[in-house]
């Protein structure tokens, strides 16, 4: 191209930020359009007043796992040593009336990490191990992505767990928690995605299930610095304004905005949430053929989830973990002691001699009574932290959202991918298909980089490296063991 190429990135979440960064760093003139007043998408933070003091709120705690290589590459643009992330030493999982598991102190080398977890976990007994379906368990080691996604098409996470015959405690604590982290009911969530997570966190990497968190709210620690970095690269950030339409302008594409303006560019990256993406594609009848458009339109949204942040006038007990996953506590899925890791919340708690506690409830049934839900969440919190029963709530923030993509049991190949039928338009986000065993924030970042790379390749410009855990199982003996197991069954029968 004999002039500077141009791009519009629609969406200022992780996917859009990665795409904008990838394009701008190669000299592309980028306009970034974001509907909210702050960057970060579903991982943004915004200011609130808590009992007269300035503090922040977000859509809830997010774990920055060590396997999030491509997200971390994005964060290194403004924080080369990742000093704004703080390690969380443990990720305890508690089952009501029963066991607690931990991922701290495990060996780093697979499969020793998994073996050590099983050996020390109170949720596994020798009798339980004897009941485990050996072939289904070995299949977790015998993976090859993206083929494994296809192999599990039509099977839910719940069905995969049923096949494994893990003990109930381990099923709830070690695996079902994963499905609900996608805000999904395990009966609706993809079994292939569950297997991919098992590979990523246990069997395909040494980082395990320990993670980091930002030292302060998301805007302060992550996205505001990245926004300034983008502006230093010449990116024009337009917010808050929604993109409402896509226009075919011969060699270029126009993006219509709700204020009546149109931004025109050589290429467009659609890095929005799922429903805005579906609306933009529906408005652009020229984009793609009918089968592709149907694939986009048929994507489903995960059930609603609730986040309840409570500012108490008393501290929670000493030693409260920053993050606690739960199972069997009614609708309560996890509890975060926000003041244990977020600087703004910590300042508030020190000043008031109080605490800031956040409750999450995922995969809410349709028609959930929010008032009744709040009562039940508070009752379950009392079971875990009876000391707050005497505390006064001096401020609270309650939100319910239902805008996360559902990674369901449909065939993997039916999910929209980064490239569209029109070379000028790409997609990015945590609901967009890619070959790698990645998920959530890392899938958003990865597809954002991929979208940028797709356009850069057309212009003959250098793309950006992508990293992932190994795409295949790391244990060559496993396929032979599975064949031997199958042969022994045939002989016995």
Residue ranges and their predicted role:
Residues 15, 38, 275:
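Conserved Rossmann-like nucleotide-cofactor binding loop
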Residues 105, 317-493:
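Conserved flavin/dinucleotide-binding core of flavoenzymes
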Residues 5-32:
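N-terminal Rossmann-like FAD-binding beta1-loop-alpha1 element of flavoenzymes
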Residues 85-86, 236-240, 396-397, 426:
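General small-molecule cofactor/ligand-binding pocket signal
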Residues 26, 241-357, 362-368, 384, ...:
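Mid-domain catalytic core of redox enzymes
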Residues 52-137, 146-147:
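Dinucleotide-binding Rossmann-like beta1-alpha1 core, especially the glycine-rich loop
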Residues 136-245:
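Active-site/ligand-binding neighborhood in enzyme catalytic cores
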Residues 24-50:
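Glycine-rich FAD pyrophosphate-binding loop
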């Amino acid at each position: 191209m004999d002039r500077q190429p141009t791009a519009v990135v629609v969406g200022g979440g992780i996917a859009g930020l990665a795409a904008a960064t990838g394009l701008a760093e190669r000299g592309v003139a980028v306009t970034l359009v974001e509907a909210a007043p702050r960057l970060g998408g579903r991982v943004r933070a915004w200011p609130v007043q808590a009992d007269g003091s300035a503090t922040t709120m977000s859509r809830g705690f997010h774990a920055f796992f060590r396997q999030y290589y491509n997200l971390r590459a994005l964060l290194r643009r403004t924080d080369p040593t990742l000093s704004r992330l703080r390690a969380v030493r443990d990720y305890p999982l508690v089952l009501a009336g029963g066991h607690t598991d931990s991922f701290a102190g495990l060996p780093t080398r697979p499969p020793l990490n998994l073996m050590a977890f099983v050996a020390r976990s109170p949720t596994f007994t020798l009798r339980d191990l004897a009941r485990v379906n050996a072939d289904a368990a070995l299949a977790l080691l015998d993976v090859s992505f993206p083929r494994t996604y296809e192999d599990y098409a039509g099977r839910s996470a719940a069905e995969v767990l049923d096949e494994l015959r893990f003990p109930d405690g381990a099923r709830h604590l070690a695996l079902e928690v994963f499905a609900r982290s996608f805000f999904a009911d395990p009966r609706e969530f993809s079994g292939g995605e569950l297997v991919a997570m098992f590979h990523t966190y246990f069997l395909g990497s040494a980082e395990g299930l320990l993670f980091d968190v930002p030292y302060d709210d998301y805007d302060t620690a992550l996205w505001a610095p990245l926004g300034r970095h983008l502006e230093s690269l010449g990116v024009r950030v337009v917010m808050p304004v929604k993109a409402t339409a896509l226009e075919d302008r011969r060699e270029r594409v126009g993006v219509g905005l709700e204020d009546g303006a149109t931004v025109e560019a050589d290429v467009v990256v659609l890095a929005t949430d799922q429903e805005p993406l579906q609306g933009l594609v529906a408005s652009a009848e020229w984009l793609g053929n009918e089968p592709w458009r149907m694939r986009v339109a048929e994507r489903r949204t995960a059930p609603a989830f609730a986040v309840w942040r409570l500012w108490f006038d008393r501290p929670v007990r000493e030693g409260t973990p920053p993050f606690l996953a739960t199972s069997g506590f009614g609708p309560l899925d996890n509890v975060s002691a926000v003041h244990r890791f977020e600087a703004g919340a910590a300042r508030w708690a020190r000043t008031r001699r109080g605490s800031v506690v956040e409750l999450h409830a995922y995969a809410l049934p349709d028609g959930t009574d929010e008032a009744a839900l709040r009562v039940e969440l508070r009752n379950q919190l009392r079971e875990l932290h009876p000391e707050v029963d005497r505390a006064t709530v001096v401020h609270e923030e309650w939100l319910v959202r239902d805008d996360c993509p559902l990674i369901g049991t449909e065939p993997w190949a039916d999910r929209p991918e980064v490239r569209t039928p029109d070379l000028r338009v790409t997609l990015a986000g945590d609901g967009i298909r890619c070959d790698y065993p990645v998920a959530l924030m890392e899938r958003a970042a990865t597809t954002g980089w991929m979208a940028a790379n797709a356009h850069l390749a057309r212009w003959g410009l250098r793309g950006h490296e992508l990293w992932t855990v190994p795409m295949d199982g790391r244990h060559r003996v496993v396929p032979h063991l599975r064949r031997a197991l199958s042969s022994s069954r045939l002989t016995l029968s």
